[in-house]
């Protein structure tokens, strides 16, 4: 059967329907795929015949305006020794390229694309004051291209810029570091810079633990260099950064202040303890070790001396002077009359004037210990119950004490006394003298020789005070019956010339601490009668008392036994020795007090200097507004 003939069935409608259905159910191309194809077509269109080496200007005389900005991400380090600042920044650059324009309607409404920055023209902006590394940007990120020809490029960079570090007020210093950006090839007639912002963007800044950015302002400058006749523009950002001083205050300043305080305490330490020089040397050694540790902390620059370096030098001189002064004070402290003689001006200045100015009061102690001992002995000897009395007999005063400035008891034998002048005997007593008979008194059973009448205060010129010793003897009952008079005491007196007494250590006469015990038989030989018979109980008349107080007795008329002479010599030696020791002790105490006054002077001087040095450390940075 022929197709299309009469009576033939109509052709099937399946293929056209299938075609229609297939055309209706076919997926249309996605917008992303369409945009990708549009960007691909756009890139092919833009870069066909594009030359990245030529400036993007339609006229050769036109200027490419590059908008420049800076955003800092982190202040990495400030190297005071090498004088450079390391920063992590984003360099913002924006310019127009007329060869990279298109109509978004022709390319599926594509308004911007990201393209590799190596494919387009870029301004050769570098960091002028680069200290280490590359001057230009090394990491070339993609640029953002807009349909109107605007190009935005923000590559990150780590710069090490040169920075003039001024460590005068270290660690309270504030630095001013700059970063200078500009075109290295094109002058102002080809490329001009326009600042995006007047300050550095710090929104994404990572805070540093040592520095804080106070200010970061950018300024536009033009400069004509010696190499070229053209004028070159640049944008300079000035970073004002301030150091955080907490670390250096704890680890540097506080130890220095404590060492200075230890140096001051050296002058408060007593010299007798023997640790003054040890403390000084210990402080000096600790300061030396401390200086070895902080050499890595202090900026090692020779342009200026840091303030903390000056303070450390001041502390070192401080400690050294304290050692020198301590040695001098110890020398003064250990002086004695056998090695040094104290000048009058030293005694006047350091024992009288300076202590009053320093409000120092010396304790009023009795220096003559031997004199106090003898005075106490005299008080005991003068007590009413000291001398024994027989029964039924009233007590008779027989103890004699010298009223002179030196209350001492001593003896001088015939071999010790000079021939001339003749000394006068004096035996004053604190009590009423015992009754003594006179020659004119017929009722006196016991006549008193003229040689036994001691005057109370008579003394020949050029003589020392009389020294007397009384010995007590109680008569027996047979003696009282035979003689009729009870003799109780004998008094032996002797004097020494003034020139002989003055030759003993040149000081006041000191007292002997003890008397030798002797009986009446040892005082005088048995075959020689005593010139002084006894003291009688009869009350004397006023004339007899006056005569007894005015009679002079030569010392050579008083004979001494050998045992008593040896005892007297021993007592005299002990008295002279104690007197010399007491004099030496007094002078030594004066030297020690002079040393203490010198210590107190330098204590206040060093305290004032330490306070002034500490104020000098903190005051200049505070006045400069850095604290």
Curated annotation (Swiss-Prot):
Subcellular location: Synaptic cell membrane; Cell membrane
InterPro entries associated with the record: Neur_chan_lig-bd, Neur_chan_lig-bd_sf, Neur_channel, Neuro-gated_channel_TM_sf, Neuro_actylchol_rec, Neurotrans-gated_channel_TM, Neurotransmitter_ion_chnl_CS, Nicotinic_acetylcholine_rcpt
Main localization of the protein described in the UniProt heading: membrane
Glycan attachment residues as annotated in the record: 59, 109, 176
Database matches in SUPFAM superfamilies: Neurotransmitter-gated ion-channel transmembrane pore, Nicotinic receptor ligand binding domain-like
Disulfide bonds, paired cysteine numbers: 163-177, 227-228
Highest rank taxon of the organism: Eukaryota
Disordered: annotated segments: 384-463
Catalytic activity: Ca(2+)(in) = Ca(2+)(out); K(+)(in) = K(+)(out); Na(+)(in) = Na(+)(out)
Gene Ontology biological process terms, A to Z: acetylcholine receptor signaling pathway; behavioral response to nicotine; cognition; DNA repair; nervous system process; response to hypoxia; response to oxidative stress; signal transduction
Calcium is among the record's keywords: yes
Keywords from the UniProt entry: Calcium, Cell membrane, Disulfide bond, Glycoprotein, Ion channel, Ion transport, Ligand-gated ion channel, Lipoprotein, Membrane, Metal-binding, Palmitate, Phosphoprotein, Receptor, Signal, Synapse, Transmembrane, Transmembrane helix, Transport
TM stretches of this protein: 245-269, 277-295, 311-332, 601-619
Lipidated sites in chain (S-palmitoyl cysteine): 273
A Gene Ontology cellular-component term: presynaptic membrane
Annotated positions binding Ca(2+): 78, 80
Cytoplasmic side: 333-600
Biased composition (Pro residues): 444-458
UniProt note on regulation of activity: Activated by a myriad of ligands such as acetylcholine, cytisine, nicotine, choline and epibatidine. Channel potentiation by calcium is stoichiometry-selective, CHRNA4:CHRNB2 nACh receptor is achieved by calcium association with topographically distinct sites framed by anionic residues within the CHRNA4 subunit and between the CHRNA4 and CHRNB2 subunits. nAChR activity is inhibited by the antagonist alpha-conotoxins BuIA, PnIA, GID and MII, small disulfide-constrained peptides from cone snails.
Membrane topology: Multi-pass membrane protein
Membrane side Extracellular: residue ranges: 32-244
Assembly and oligomerization: Neuronal AChR is composed of two different types of subunits: alpha and beta. CHRNA4 forms heteropentameric neuronal acetylcholine receptors with CHRNB2 and CHRNB4, as well as CHRNA5 and CHRNB3 as accesory subunits. Found in two major stoichiometric forms, LS (low agonist sensitivity): (CHRNA4)3:(CHRNB2)2 and HS (high agonist sensitivity): (CHRNA4)2:(CHRNB2)3, the two stoichiometric forms differ in their unitary conductance, calcium permeability, ACh sensitivity and potentiation by divalent cation. Cells produce predominantly an (CHRNA4)3:(CHRNB2)2 nAChR.
Similarity comment: family membership: Belongs to the ligand-gated ion channel (TC 1.A.9) family. Acetylcholine receptor (TC 1.A.9.1) subfamily. Alpha-4/CHRNA4 sub-subfamily.
Record NCBIfam families: LIC
Protein name listed in UniProt: Neuronal acetylcholine receptor subunit alpha-4
Lineage of source species: Eukaryota, Metazoa, Chordata, Craniata, Vertebrata
